[in-house]
Every structure is written in C-alpha cells, then in structure tokens.
Amino acid sequence: MMGDKGEKECATASSPIELGCGEGDESGNKSSMRTVETLLRLVPVALCTVSLVVMLKNSQTNDFGSLSYSDLGAFRYLVHANGICAGYSLLSAIFTAMPRPPTMSRAWTFFLLDQVLTYLILAAGAVSTEVVYLAYKGDEAVTWSDACSSFGGFCQKTTASISITFVTVLCYAVLSLISSYKLFSKYDAPICFNGKGIEIAAFHS
C-alpha cells in the first residue's frame, strides 16, 4: 500500500496542471527580473544626463579671471564618459525590456559592456575627484594654491556633478553583478572526480 501511495503522489506531482503552474511561476520570475533590470538601466540615463548638464554649464567669471570645465582635461573626460554612459544605458534598457530568449552571445555582450562602462565611469569620477580635491586643498609641495576660495561656485557645481557620477557607479556595480549572474548561471558546475580512484587505476595499468 505504501508503494501505491508513493506512485499516486508522483502522479499527482507530475500532473499537467501543476506543471503548468510551475512554468507560469518561472515565466513570472523572469518577467519581474527583466522589469527590475530595465529600471536599473534607466536610472543611469537620468543620472548621467544630470551630471553631464551640470558640468557643461559649469563656468565662472570674476575679478580673478574665468574658469570653465573645458579648461581641465579630467572634467572633459567626465563629460564624455557620462554621455557614453547615458547612451549605452538607454540602448541596453530597450534591449533588456524586449522579451527575447536568452542566448549565450547576448549574455556575454551585456557582461562585457557592463564591465567596460563600470570602469569607464569609475575612472572618470576618480580622476575628477583628484582634480577637485587639489582645487579645494591645493598642494604646498609644488606651491599650488587652492582655487575654490576664488571660484567657489565652480567647485560646488563640480562636486555635485562628481557625486552624481558616483551614484551612477553604484548602479552599474549592481548591473555588473546581474549580468555576471545571468552569464555564469548558464554554465554547468564542474564535475568532481575521485582522485583516489584515478591513482589506483593508473597504478594497476
């Protein structure tokens, strides 16, 4: 009777209704994950655009002279990096929102591009942070005086733009983790061999 009961439970568990429910749950999870990833890719579009606009409009003229973001290579790099990041974020969000079957080539493409964009925007923020730090503190070793005491408005806008850039870095760090998971989850776990058995077989041969 216990064997009959086990067979009934197996038959019930493998019924078409429950199989259909399992497939529905799986498709629902994929849809919700796709929605979350799409939103995460849209957020950097707004962040990069705001950082870009703030830096583009960042210039100040006073009795000490005039200063613009274009006078410093680090800030020009920040502008270009934010522009590239905004464009890629928008395109990747559109592709992510499209319900397409996952393929290995697509997973590799998103993984590599997300990694490149993460380091690109991180480098832009780091280099700009160093420049604005020198603008605030100066460097006595090379007799550089601080510039922010004379161009306070310029430094404030620069700090705001850099801060927004680092928020973008956090978003792309999360996106890199997601794309890494989606890629490497497609690979099977490595097969573990019994080393002792292999040694014995080699010895007897």
From Swiss-Prot:
One of its GO terms (cellular component) is plasma membrane. Keywords: Cell membrane, Membrane, Transmembrane, Transmembrane helix. It is a multi-pass membrane protein. Residues 57-77, 128-157 are extracellular. InterPro entries: CASP/CASPL, CASP_dom. Residues 1-35, 99-106, 179-205 are cytoplasmic. The keyword Ribosomal protein does not apply. The chain crosses the membrane at residues 36-56, 78-98, 107-127, 158-178. NCBIfam families: A_tha_TIGR01569 (TIGR01569). Belongs to the Casparian strip membrane proteins (CASP) family. This is CASP-like protein 2A1.
